[in-house]
């Protein structure tokens, strides 16, 4: 049974250890998916491998590299002069993320989702290169978040110019009723 009340906070050392384990876990996923893809497409089916196979491998490697590097830079700890842990880095395992109301595009959960999506697509593409079309879910999700959190509220916000605000004193003087 979950404890009632406010959730406990994590200490710097716990965040540091969990981040290290999280990065290790995602590195294993990256290496495993890349090894399966390379073994199947670039070793077993080498004669049938086309330029698209090599391009897909390069693309997935670039996505993995960028996502993993971003996650590791977020989780980079800071140490004091005496070698003690001063800051454990950003918690990569937060439930709500940095800002629950407006998700940041480089939030750790989105980067982890990109790594997992790429790994699944990469392994499944051993059966068909058409599986790479599923990777279009990532920019689709990015456009959805852009619309929901930035563009949608901006387009649907009520426009009120500062000079058009009803002035109560002016309304009382002229005798016009407020709207």
Swiss-Prot record:
Main location as per UniProt: endoplasmic reticulum
Keyword check for Iron: no
UniProt keyword annotations, A-Z: Autophagy, Endoplasmic reticulum, Membrane, Transmembrane, Transmembrane helix
GO BP terms in the entry: autophagy; vacuolar protein processing
InterPro entries the record matches: SND2/TMEM208
Renumbered residue ranges of the record's region Disordered: 159-179
Any single GO CC term annotated in Swiss-Prot or TrEMBL for this entry: vacuole
Leader sequence residues: none
Segments traversing the membrane: 25-45, 51-68, 114-136
Subcellular location: Endoplasmic reticulum membrane
Membrane topology: Multi-pass membrane protein
Role this protein plays: May function as a negative regulator of endoplasmic reticulum-stress induced autophagy.
The family this protein is said to belong to: Belongs to the TMEM208 family.
Identification of the protein by name: Transmembrane protein 208
Organism of provenance: Gallus gallus
Lineage summary: Eukaryota, Metazoa, Chordata, Craniata, Vertebrata
């Amino acid at each position: 049974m979950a404890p009632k009340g406010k959730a406990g906070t994590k200490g710097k050392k716990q965040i540091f250890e969990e981040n290290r384990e999280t990065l290790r876990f995602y590195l294993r996923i990256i290496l495993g998916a890349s090894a399966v893809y390379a073994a199947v497409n670039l070793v077993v089916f080498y004669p049938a491998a086309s330029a698209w196979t090599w391009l897909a491998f390069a693309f997935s490697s670039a996505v993995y590299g960028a996502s993993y590097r971003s996650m590791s830079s977020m989780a980079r700890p800071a140490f004091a002069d005496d070698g003690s842990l001063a800051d454990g880095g950003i918690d990569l395992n937060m439930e709500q993320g940095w800002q629950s109301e407006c998700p940041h595009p480089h939030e750790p959960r989105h980067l982890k989702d990109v790594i997992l999506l790429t790994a699944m697509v990469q392994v499944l593409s051993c059966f068909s290169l058409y599986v790479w079309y599923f990777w279009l879910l990532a920019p689709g999700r990015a456009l959805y978040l852009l619309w929901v959190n930035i563009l949608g509220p901006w387009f649907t916000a009520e426009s009120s110019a500062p000079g058009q605000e009803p002035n109560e004193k002016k309304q009382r003087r002229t005798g016009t009723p407020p709207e």
